[in-house]
Amino acid sequence: MTIYCDESGGLNAGAMTFAAVMLTPEAAAQIHARFRAVTGLRGELKGSRISLTERAYLLELFDRAGGRAWVAVAKRARLQPPADGQPPSDLALYAALLDLAIGSWLPETGGVCSDVVIDDGRYDPVILENVREAIQTGLGGWGRASLADSRRSEGVQIADVVANSLYNVEVASPRARRIGIIIEPMLASRAIRVAELTQLP
């Protein structure tokens, strides 16, 4: 299995969410093929760009395919300030959420090799390479951590939609109520689980 990762939002926007989605590459490709055939979508799949109906269909395909996700969430109003009183940097928050989301998966992998694929678009490549190396150290010999251009990774694009869905709910966006209805069955079945970050390490 592969864990695909992407984030949405930022503390300046009220919350940041980080989705770690577990799917086989084959399942991710099949979800994309069906979604694009039905909707006619061309180009990159982004949670911030699709309609509510398209989001519901994509997440239904994800659920049917046996996809699962841990989503780490940090909300500005509930995040305790660091000891120095300074607001955390975007990168520090990103790294903490990534660690929480991936860390939530590792006890459940049962020793099965898990590859972790991270979107390479948010930060400088050198910074992200350091993040990748830290994840690789945590995985040890159980898997491989890599960076991917989201435009070329079907799984990362699905993770983007999951992260964006939870972000909308957390910040109570105008679409939050409808998105909450869309994801409620997946939260109830634990296909999507949420871990909240309230304090940076």
Predicted regions and their residues:
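Phosphate-ester processing/binding pockets and catalytic centers
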Residues: 1-201
